[in-house]
């Protein structure tokens, strides 16, 4: 797994391609173009076309792409774009819950950054961390808290999320 520190990552919705160039010029360590949460369902195809056109017009650009979650009808098309476009340097896989999901994403021949953001993903963390194609692990604390029914203002909830964060950190060093 890559051990370099990513201090700053900017998420940019693919529905706003004019913001991609601005983000790339910001000095952020990583620019993640979002095809998932920041994009309404009825705009998914257009968002992917926007990103494809941006990368065609800017062959020097290097971005990560947060694809749609496993089992989402748009994920296969997202992975195809990532495979075809040399400007995509890694795939950010939301809602990762199994090594098989990671390996499916890695089949596009790009490194994968799975996001652990559910109780199932946390339980499957040892297998996910050993899956082929992983470059680094990431953590979705808000979604994990929602999945587990935790109150965002609870001290106990913060302790649980800290334990999850610690587990992800340990597995990222293996």
Report each predicted region and the residues it spans.
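Conserved alpha/beta-domain cores
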Residues: 2-174
